[in-house]
Amino acid sequence: MKLVIVESPAKAKTINKYLGDEFKVIASFGHIRDLPSKKGSVLPDKNFLMEYDISDKAGKYVDAIVKEARKAEVVYLATDPDREGESISWHVAEVIKEKNKVESDDFFKRVAFNEITKKAIMNAVANPRKLDTNLVNAQQARRALDYLVGFTLSPLLWRKLPGCKSAGRVQSVALRLICDREDEIERFKSEEYWDISLKMQNSNNDLFTAKLTHVNDQKLKKFSIINEKEAKDLTQKLKLQKFYVEKIEKKQQKRQPQPPFITSSLQQEAARKLGFSAKKTMQIAQKLYEGVDIGKETIGLITYMRTDGVTLSNDAIADIRKLIDKNYGNQYLPIKPRIYQSKVKNAQEAHEAIRPTNITYTPDSLKQKLEKDYYKLYELIWHRTIACQMENVIMDLVIANLASENKEYLAKANGSIIAFDGFYKVYRESLDDEDEEDNKMLPPLKEQEHIKTKEVIPNKHFTEPPPRYSEASLVKKLEELGIGRPSTYASILSVLQDRKYVALEKKRFIPEELGRLVTVFLVGFFKKYVEYDFTAGLENELDEIAAGKLEWKTALNNFWRGFNHNIESVNEQKITEIINYLQKALDYHLFGEDKESKVCPSCKTGQLSLKLGKFGAFLACSNYPECTFKKSIVSGNDNNEDEGDPSTILNDNKILGTDQDGVEIYLKKGPYGPYIQLGEQCGKVKPKRTPVPANLKQSEITLEIALKLLNLPLKIGIHKDSGEEIIIGYSKFGPYIKYMCKFISVPKKYDFLNLSLNDAMKLIQNNKAKLEKKYG
């Protein structure tokens, strides 16, 4: 009997049908050995000896493997074709050697395949190799590094930062990215700027829109027009001008398809198009790879899903091109196959890109046979694979340059149309921030043609801070920096959320206070080890180990020597030194720029400062013990809060920007929650204030939103039937419409700050209908 060992029962079931009766396929159910979660599992003083244990969960599977191996003439190790798969095979072989007293390595044959198809399996079995010790050592080095960081840094965190749960070699760097972005957002000061749009009409009475680009030969920049007065003055001048078409430019633009999916791009696109988390994407992809039941049989539908290679096999390309020619026509088929090269930092490119194993299994043919989410992901992979070998999209672009008759003002109008849809026929890549109009057409225009200015529209804008990371954009950033590996991204994001270091709100990552504390501590006392370049450099070293260019224990020794010295140094630091550093580093985040926000809300004379207690970090009054005010700054850690009003702590008290008169607008916190304030209090004259609606998070409040809130109640418009005003406002009961002395609540599904006149009239009509139904 020939024994074949794979990781999962699903994979075993699929492979078993391709091999004859002389083979027996069994599963290891993942890793059978690992480093136990205790001190001493990796021993630097003993040349980094690693003490592996068989887990209780894996015990029964190991017994079965050992028992079957005793009957076998040969053992085929058929785990996944990457470092982790190589490592699992090595552990299986080591356990069999130990338990069955096997001395010869010839008893084991390593078989690797990129897809679970009969052709790939039979070819792998016919061409076995030996275990690749370089790949095994690279995986052992990664595991040792992660252990050494986790099991030396985490206990130090527990002592120095009570309440913090863990630190990890890669997770801490990903957390720093999220926290650094939040710092940028908090310190960002929104600035006002304007641009001018002109609604124009050609000689055929066709309307189009242009944008003012030059005034008196000076090109307008973003901040050329910075306030309403300047915008209105310019608007009045433009209304007096007559424009004509000075020049028309026409050109073609070609758009090339994106490469086939790699792990990171699949996670990003599944997040954007399907709303899947990275974890969910990988779970479904794993099932599609290992084999799913499609009615008549169980087959592996996609190639291996942990890869950073963008190449496709020659056979796959030939099949794809054949299908394109048959289904879409020769005009969609390039003369030559497209060959892609990876742009990923540290790409290993050992495997093909992610593609269907059989391109003739179209999504439509499988729609009734796959679970809904399995179908969605397969459809995404299939379309991307087809598109990557299709012709370019061709865009016809038209640019109309307009000039005033006195040449003082220039404007520009752009139009585009898809001349040939190319790969758009089957697939378009999504973007995090899409702002693309492929079919914004201009009406027919001729050079020197005089055109009418129907309307001049000044547009007010505010600069916005960089957006928070989504799962897709964070994976992309990690990939760009060379941090982590395709197989690790999903687990990194999950761990950060499980540890309560970050929250995912509206599909964007927001750091929790606990996460910010950990990051500030690590940046202050372990800066080298959370630097992006250093972490990427370690990935390079692991690649060199895998390639046989670097001895793995040399790499571990180089890392450990400096890291252990850092640990010992921080262990000796006094807790007061750490608190003082944290206080200084978190000062802006906790209190903003307003010195008053540090005043104790209980005694009114003491100053709030950061303290560390057994339940975590908290703010306390400097007048202790006379004043015992305390407030936890970590959500869920309110054990140390016994006096004072917690809602009065000013954790978010910052300047959002200024209004058109230059008066500063603040976001503050008071006894009844957060509120917006216009200017400072002058004597007994209180500044204008307005509460922040309960459905708005403080982190979402921008200058633009604050200005809208301060302007409430606000006239939306005139009711077309009655001629009466419709007013939008906000009270302690929530947003409302005021119409003919009646107050009508605005449901949560509406964005009341941007409520349209039509929606307001619908709400008025619905309210009227309800009253008529109720009272007759």
UniProtKB/Swiss-Prot annotation:
Catalytic activity field: ATP-independent breakage of single-stranded DNA, followed by passage and rejoining
The residues that the entry says bind Mg(2+) are 7, 80
Q: Which domain of life is it from?
A: Bacteria
Toprim domain location, by residue? 1-111
Site, Interaction with DNA: residue positions = 31, 142-143, 146, 158, 306, 499
Task: Please name the GO terms that the record assigns under molecular function.
Answer: DNA binding; DNA topoisomerase type I (single strand cut, ATP-independent) activity; zinc ion binding
Annotated SMART domains: TOP1Ac, TOP1Bc, TOPRIM
The yes or no answer to whether the keyword NAD is present is: no
Write out the catalytic residues in the record: 304
Record GO cellular component, one term: chromosome
Q: Where is this region: Interaction with DNA?
A: 166-171
Q: Which GO terms describe its biological process?
A: DNA topological change
| InterPro entries assigned to the protein according to its UniProt record, in alphabetical order | Topo_IA (IPR000380), Topo_IA_2 (IPR003601), Topo_IA_AS (IPR023406), Topo_IA_cen (IPR013497), Topo_IA_cen_sub1 (IPR013824), Topo_IA_cen_sub2 (IPR013825), Topo_IA_cen_sub3 (IPR013826), Topo_IA_core_domain (IPR023405)
The top EC class is isomerase
Q: Which cofactor does the UniProt annotation name?
A: Mg(2+)
UniProt keywords (A-Z) are: DNA-binding, Isomerase, Magnesium, Metal-binding, Topoisomerase, Zinc, Zinc-finger
Which residue range or ranges hold the Topo IA-type catalytic domain? 132-568
* One Pfam family, short name: Toprim
State the EC number(s).
5.6.2.1
ZnF C4-type span = 600-627
Q: What does this protein do?
A: Releases the supercoiling and torsional tension of DNA, which is introduced during the DNA replication and transcription, by transiently cleaving and rejoining one strand of the DNA duplex. Introduces a single-strand break via transesterification at a target site in duplex DNA. The scissile phosphodiester is attacked by the catalytic tyrosine of the enzyme, resulting in the formation of a DNA-(5'-phosphotyrosyl)-enzyme intermediate and the expulsion of a 3'-OH DNA strand. The free DNA strand then undergoes passage around the unbroken strand, thus removing DNA supercoils.
| Record family assignment | Belongs to the type IA topoisomerase family.
> Quaternary arrangement and interactors, per the entry?
Monomer.
Name of the protein: DNA topoisomerase 1
Q: What is the lineage of its organism?
A: Bacteria, Pseudomonadati, Pseudomonadota, Alphaproteobacteria, Rickettsiales
